[in-house]
Amino acid sequence: MLEGIIWAVSAGIMLGLYALPEKFTRNFSYENTWSLFFVITMFIVPYIAAVLLLNGLEIFGMISSSVLVKMGIASLLWGIGVVLWGKAISHIGLSLGFSIFIGTLIFIGSLIPWFIDASGNFQINLPDNNILFTILAGLSIVLIGVVFNGRAGLIREADESEIKKEIPSSTKNSMLSGILIAVVGGVLATAFSYSNAIGKEPFILAAQELGLAEWKASIGVMNVIYVSGGIAAIIYYAVALTSNKAWGLFKTKSLGKNVGFIIIMSILNFTASVTFSYAASELGPDAGKTVGYAIFNAMSVLTATLSGLIVGEWKQASSSARKNLYIGLISMVLGIIIVSIGNGLGA
């Protein structure tokens, strides 16, 4: 149990930190940083992980085409959602971009299993009332946290505009736009849960047939999701780089350092998911989706928020903005814990 908890904490910290290196890139536009991130994260890192941990690509040939097609379509939506997540972080910072996106993802994603079966078909499957109301209570608190975080962002924008003597509504990258982008991204990114639900069982059976540990099946699932989602990301960034005439920025003298920071982002992002899968297997099927789920998500939100504070995202924010941020953070962590307790009631 202790080992599983340590791995879950580590996974949450890695996910919370993954976007931080973006703040240290130089002479890159948003499009340059995130396009490279998606190329490395969605294609290169998953391939290396599959070769090293799955002993090659044989496992993918053992999965039926119908499963792969369903996973691929859902993953395209997830890819769009993650693109919006990166855009939200660029607009409103690490603390808000992360917490609002993850909060929305948890809220919508927790409802999906009640209406989608393991085959990806629509089927109402509500849990017992005690489980249902506990989870709904937790999700309501998560939603309250998202609202407080959004309010904190709007207050912060007003504070910063007052200091700079600007009119808040005239700023190009408005806080409200960033918040909406994070929410829409979170909704679309719930397609990850749909894709994972479809692919989980087939990949576990294939992994067992190959003599691999069951937790390694998640690497196969993530490869399909990441590559499919990466297609959406590559199309978007190719258009964005062209329309904003940003291709030339790749010639900067800071390219080497920037690529180094982006590789760190990619490794943290992918490794966080793999580490959590391992943590869940160590904790067992019951504790994995309760204790592990709570620790992973709570630590990621806490880490991202603290990182944003440390690098000065809230330096010019008033005490009112910070107060709303802290209330939102506490609400989200509390809500995540209650959702996990509700899941545990059904274990």
Regions found by a protein language model. Give the residues of each.
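Polytopic alpha-helical membrane proteins, predominantly small-molecule transporters/carriers
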Residues: 1-347
